Amino acid sequence: MCADSAGWVPILEADCLNTKLKDMNVDYLFKAVLSLETMEECYSFFEDLCTVPELKALSQRLEVAKMLSEGCVYSDIVSKTGASTATISRVNRSLNYGSDGYKVVFERVKG
């Protein structure tokens, strides 16, 4: 990991994160998320930041990733989450070829 010269939160090396994504605004967003201390603070922040459909889409992707990592098949994931097969495929690609972000979260978050 490395930090930029402006003192922003540590950022991942270029081989771990798409360089088109990495900038000061994204760093500030991540720093803001890392500053939240309670579930209530998270709800308040994300309610202000995102529309309901945006937040539902993010949470759906996380649920899809969890189900894929547990070995669920696409048809079961579609039935339970309502996600499209395109979304499931995209998440599956991230699980298999991504930066292991989902893996880190699943190891740290239980339930």
Language model: regions and residue ranges:
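Short, amphipathic alpha-helical "recognition" segments used to contact nucleic acids or chromatin
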Residues: 58-72
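General nucleic-acid-binding
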Residues: 1-36
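Short alpha-helical "recognition helix" segments of helix-turn-helix
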Residues: 76-81, 88
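Short, solvent-exposed alpha-helical "recognition" segments
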Residues: 93-106
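Major-groove recognition helix of helix-turn-helix-like DNA-binding domains
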Residues: 64, 88-95
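Short, Lys/Arg-enriched anionic-surface-contact patches
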Residues: 41-60, 110
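Residues at alpha-helix boundaries and the short loops/turns that link adjacent helices
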Residues: 36-40, 52, 71
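General marker for long, soluble alpha-helical cores
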Residues: 75, 103, 108-111
